[in-house]
């Protein structure tokens, strides 16, 4: 049976929705919200009714009857750290999404919106693999400073989706393989997946790992300390150097990887150096994760928007091919990944997890 699903993925200035029948996309729409509309609301949670009305209006215009839906799936938000999987939305989750226990983020509305619409039609609401998925082993959490433990914040939804895709295409299960998955987008996350769990991964938002189009990755801590207390920068300005204006933006004044690739291909000296450093850092992180997996790696999987570039993937493969074969799944399909998570539960392949 092909289940009919509504998928909701809220961003800061847009809400992406999809309607799926099984894994087949019936509708995909990006509902854009102007700055003026968003600024009317003091908090992200205050946008709930506004976004819900916009979603229902578009569904009606497109001839989608919400009463025909089997479930509603939202993108998971900044909840407490949880293990990966599909979670049924409950009151405890809604309360934590309202307050944003790990910070404000538009994705916090995903679970709440899906719950609101599902309640109206008497159906179930789910979230799947939010960014706060944390399956790290205790040994990976120590940083050297007890007050600063390493944290798991990464592209969990896409990393898990492509890992499961690899397993399916190789006639095995995600729980039976060891993979290193590299997501390359605005941020870069490199995860060690051992038998269905991400036992180590860099904090791709503001922690460690390779630099990326907009993020600094791991930086020398002593120099960062000097910068913080130099009196030249506010806390916000330093944070912006790490997230938003780090990486490619800092070195080349662009957040578009294609610009760096072009400069490197043309032999531009500075552009080539930045590009080579980007490849070097990703390959180095892959090497680290190979050690985490005791050298037992079935494949290295590259994904995210930058993985569409053969120039990038070939350069990485040249450095890491001695570890394991490489597989490339360019881009990311968050709506499909959310749909697949719900289908696994509705089909009885997995049980819905309970958020506490």
From Swiss-Prot:
Enzyme Commission number(s): 2.7.2.7
An individual GO BP term: acetate metabolic process
SUPFAM superfamilies attached to this UniProt entry: Actin-like ATPase domain (SSF53067)
PROSITE patterns: ACETATE_KINASE_1 (PS01075), ACETATE_KINASE_2 (PS01076)
UniProt keyword Endoplasmic reticulum, yes or no: no
Cellular localization per UniProt: Cytoplasm
Coarse class of the protein's main subcellular location: cytoplasm
Keywords recorded for this protein, A-Z: ATP-binding, Cytoplasm, Kinase, Nucleotide-binding, Transferase
Alphabetical list of InterPro entries matching this protein: Aliphatic_acid_kin_short-chain (IPR000890), Aliphatic_acid_kinase_CS (IPR023865), ATPase_NBD (IPR043129), Butyrate_kin (IPR011245)
Catalytic activity: butanoate + ATP = butanoyl phosphate + ADP
Keyword Zinc listed: no
GO cellular component: cytoplasm
Enzyme class: transferase
Pathway: Lipid metabolism; butanoate metabolism
Gene3D superfamilies: 3.30.420.40
Annotated CDD domains: ASKHA_NBD_BK
A GO term, aspect molecular function: ATP binding
Function of the molecule: Catalyzes the conversion of butyryl-CoA through butyryl phosphate to butyrate.
Family of the protein in this entry: Belongs to the acetokinase family.
Name of the featured protein: Butyrate kinase
Organism listed in the record: Clostridium perfringens (strain 13 / Type A)
Gene that encodes it: buk
